[in-house]
A protein has these predicted regions:
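Beta-strand/loop-rich accessory regions of lumenal/periplasmic or secreted enzymes
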Residues: 2-282
């Protein structure tokens, strides 16, 4: 790390932009929103919409008994409000940007506080850690805890080391074996009659999202030796899946929606059986 390339940190107060520039990449933050809005590597834009904390999933058939409290608290429409934003040079070739947000639905009390720390290295690597603090004691079990971002649609190929090739969740994964898998983003979508949460891959240690030439983003769990994460990559948002009643109603976006979950709630079988076990609830 001591041999990292130098980084330039520039702030345009008039445009409310903080930029971190390396030898072949630029990362931009909106200082009013406290969000990463651009990540350009070798002239290629990797971000279509800023990464944000995400706590909602499109309800499955098994979620019909818990979806009401999810929506009562507005988990499907949470918006971040910036509380604090700062940038610091940790050492030569290493810059850390920290943003504190509170998430709430419109005209509702704040539900969750997040502290996101982006550590940017001179070689182009970015380390993201997010701390979550609930602000309401009465919160229902959450569907997921993670980050969601949109990337350009050209990045439509997925390769991962984790459970596959079929979808897997904390309590539904025995038939999905650990290995290396490749498929298109379109092929990760499970076309249930009623659109809903689908296509997750549990216990993932690393996954790459690339274009036809193999250029893209590699996501790695820092705790890969001990625990993985769950991810989905779709051409639909959770809200689109929730609102559609049948598959033909879905119109694919031109971008790829990526969800990376530290934890994903269990699926259970509560459409006609028991809800998820306590150990699979968040």
């Amino acid at each position: 790390i001591s041999d990292m390339e130098a980084l330039n940190v520039l702030e345009d107060e008039e445009e409310s932009i903080l930029s971190v520039e390396g030898a072949d990449f630029d990362v931009w933050f909106d200082t009013r929103l406290g969000e990463m809005i651009s990540w350009v590597v070798d002239g290629n834009e990797l971000i279509e919409r800023a990464p944000r904390a995400n706590f909602f999933r499109a309800p499955t058939d098994n979620d019909k008994h818990v979806m009401e409290p999810w929506k009562k608290f507005g988990l499907d429409r949470l918006l971040p409000k910036l509380r604090d934003f700062k940038a610091e040079t940790v050492r030569p070739g290493c810059v850390r940007v920290t943003a504190t947000h509170v998430y709430s639905a419109c005209n509702r009390l704040p539900l969750i506080e997040t502290v996101a720390k982006w550590t940017i290295f001179g070689n182009g690597d970015i380390r993201l850690s997010v701390d979550y603090t609930p602000l309401r004691e009465s919160l229902p079990p959450l569907p997921r805890m993670g980050v969601q971002l949109h990337v350009p649609g050209a990045y439509d190929r997925v390769e991962w080391y984790g459970r596959g090739p079929i979808e897997s969740y904390p309590d539904i994964r025995a038939a999905a074996y650990i290995g290396t898998y490749r498929m298109t983003v379109d092929d990760t979508h499970e076309p249930y009659v009623r659109p809903q949460e689908n296509g997750a891959h549990a216990d993932t240690r690393a996954f790459a999202l690339t274009d036809a030439l193999g250029f893209g983003i590699l996501f790695i769990s820092e705790k890969a030796a001990d625990e993985g994460f769950s991810f989905t990559a779709h051409n639909y948002t959770d809200q689109m899946l929730d609102e559609a009643k049948h598959q033909p109603e879905l119109e694919a976006l031109e971008e790829t929606v990526v969800s990376i979950d530290w934890r994903h709630g269990g699926i259970g079988s509560n459409s006609c059986g028991p809800e998820p076990q306590e150990k699979y609830k968040l």
